[in-house]
Amino acid sequence: MINNFDQQIQYIPQFQQMQHQMQQQQQQQMQQQQQQQQQQQPQQMQIQLSTHEERLELASQSSPFEEKVTLNGLQKNIKVVIKNSPFNVQLRLKKANEIDLNCVAFESTLLYDCDTNEEKEVDFVKVKPVEHKASPNETGELVNIELRIKVLTSQHEDMFFRVKIEGQDPISKEPIKGLYALTHSIKVISKPEQLKKKQPPKKRTWNDILLESVSKIQHQQHEQQKLIEKLLQQQAGLSGSTSTTNNNNTTTTTTTTSSNNITSSSAINLPSPPSSTSSSPSSSPSSSPTLVNSHLLTSTLNNTSSNNLNSSSNTLNNNNNNNNNNSNTSTSNNNNCNINNNNNNNNNNNNNNISGFEDSFKQMMNAYTQLDPRQRAEKVRRVFRNASSRDSETLSELLDLFITEGVGGQLGTAVAPLPNSPPRLSNSSTQIQNSNNNNNNNNNNNNNNNNNNNNSNNNNSTNNNNNNNNNNNNNSTIPNNPFMSSHSNNGDPYPFFSNNSFDNDSFNSFGGSSNSEFIPF
């Protein structure tokens, strides 16, 4: 027994040594494992040794819409998102190169947006109300997180939400202290059409309506006042120019008596456009009848200057030529008012009696007669083809009036007799008579001047004789107007239409003798 006990005592140190060796081996294995873990994940040790300071901040947050809401006297910008639609949030480190975000796992939590700093999580049963997908950049300083919220604001008593994003240890899933960030306030809706609905406009009060209408009326009155002032200024400028031109016209001498009588007598057969004596003379070129009158004046003055006149008559003719040139630039016979009041009234009455329609009609007839007979039909046909509907109606009405006034039946046949009517003088015949009376009055005035001035010198008598000769020459050299001479019968009530038949060959109205070429309206 003693021997066995001694043997056991001998084995005790060996057993202790074995235990010590086994412990050392276990410690070595533990150290090796720790070294391997440190080699594989060196950043994990740094994360565990981190402090409690906030390391993440919100860089940006996207949303389809935004709203401004005032809660408890504070105005907030609410990010409006659509349920189950993704929106992005970017987070970055406050201190660069502190942690590599590529080695961090992120977790998202949906919280209520409370006025207090209390973090109250949104309850759920199985499905989390928020999902996320993190995408760090290459440097590990910035991370882009895509979020989706699966609950509505209306389902939670119209409360707004906030999302908390927190960094965790990828192995132990423990949160890293200070590595988190909160998003802005979020409102979740079901459809985007909810935001596009227009709010019903407020009803306008009567005061607003009245104020708006009064402002419009005031603006219109202001614009009208501006227009009236502008028109008054233009009228004042025209009246000033008219007074100056009238003063220049009144300075003409009585030596232009014969030249003015020439223009008045020549204007009988070739009428000029009517104008009032108060109108200002225009600086534009005169019309065609006035140009014809000027040609007649130059021809008659050249004929009289070819006679054997003394030096005083030549001076008188030069003065008459200058005065006639001035009278051609005027629009009315203003110079006659400075010679004789009676002659001025008669001439103005004669000019005013000539209507614009008769002048235009005579010009049309004159232009038609000047056409080549072979081209008349084509010209008239072209005019009717190019005429508008309104022009065609006007021409049809004009043709009806011609037929009513006596141009009845087919063209080229005898015209039906006109109904009996009291004889009346036409405007052209009265104009000729008035012009002859004016010439007689001028001649009588010249004869009276010659009788009263018997004691004058030979130059004055020569001038008076030249004036009488000029009047006689002008009366003899005035060409006969075919529209006046052929219808000068004072007893005919319709001087432009006679009872005699007319032939298409001589008066080729529409360019042919057959009725088939007549162009209907």
From Swiss-Prot:
Keywords: Coiled coil. The keyword Phosphoprotein does not apply. Residues 14-41 form a coiled coil. GO terms for molecular function: sequence-specific DNA binding. GO terms for cellular component: nucleus. Residues 238-266, 275-353, 423-482 have a biased composition (Low complexity). InterPro entries: CudA-like. The keyword Coiled coil applies. Signal peptide: none annotated. Residues 238-357, 413-491 are annotated as: Disordered. PANTHER family: REGULATOR CUDA, PUTATIVE-RELATED, TRANSCRIPTIONAL REGULATOR CUDA-RELATED. This is Uncharacterized protein DDB_G0286447. The lineage of its organism: Eukaryota, Amoebozoa, Evosea, Eumycetozoa, Dictyostelia.
